[in-house]
C-alpha cells in the first residue's frame, strides 16, 4: 500500500456529516484552541464552494458579520470539526457561488429548496 494512503487513513476523522451542496445554509461547530483552553465556536453561513475530492475535500462558508463578508474554508475531514448541521437547503443553479461576493442585502438571498425529510420509524 502507498505510504500517502496509509497516512491519510490514520488522520481520517471518521465522523459522519450530513450531505450538503452549494447554496445551503449550514452551521459548523469548530473546536478552537486558545492558549491552554479549548472551546467550540459556531460558524453559520452559506456554502459558496465545495472543492477537492476524497480526503482532501473542503468547503467554503460565507457569512456577513457587522456588514462585512467573511469567508472561511473548512476541510471536511478535519478533526477539529465537531458537528455540521444543515439549517436551510438552497435552490441554486451554480456549483460555485462567487457572485454572492458582490451582492448585499435582499439581493444576496437564496431561494429555499423544499426537502422531504425521511422519518426514522
Curated annotation (Swiss-Prot):
GO terms for cellular component: cytosolic large ribosomal subunit. GO terms for molecular function: structural constituent of ribosome. InterPro entries: Ribosomal_bL19, Ribosomal_bL19_CS, Ribosomal_bL19_sf, Translation_prot_SH3-like_sf. Disulfide bonds: none annotated. This protein is located at the 30S-50S ribosomal subunit interface and may play a role in the structure and function of the aminoacyl-tRNA binding site. PANTHER family: LARGE RIBOSOMAL SUBUNIT PROTEIN BL19M, RIBOSOMAL PROTEIN L19. This is Large ribosomal subunit protein bL19. It comes from Porphyromonas gingivalis (strain ATCC BAA-308 / W83).
Amino acid at each position: 500500500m502507498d505510504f500517502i494512503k496509509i497516512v491519510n487513513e490514520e488522520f481520517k476523522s471518521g465522523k459522519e456529516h450530513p450531505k450538503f451542496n452549494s447554496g445551503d445554509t449550514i452551521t459548523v461547530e469548530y473546536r478552537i484552541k486558545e492558549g491552554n483552553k479549548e472551546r467550540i465556536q459556531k460558524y453559520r453561513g452559506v456554502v459558496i464552494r465545495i472543492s477537492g475530492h476524497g480526503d482532501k475535500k473542503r468547503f467554503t462558508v460565507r457569512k456577513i458579520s457587522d456588514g462585512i463578508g467573511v469567508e472561511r474554508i473548512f476541510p471536511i475531514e478535519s478533526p477539529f470539526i465537531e458537528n455540521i448541521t444543515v439549517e436551510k437547503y438552497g435552490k441554486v443553479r451554480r456549483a460555485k457561488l462567487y457572485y454572492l461576493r458582490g451582492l448585499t442585502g435582499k439581493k444576496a438571498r437564496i431561494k429555499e429548496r423544499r426537502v422531504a425529510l425521511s422519518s426514522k420509524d
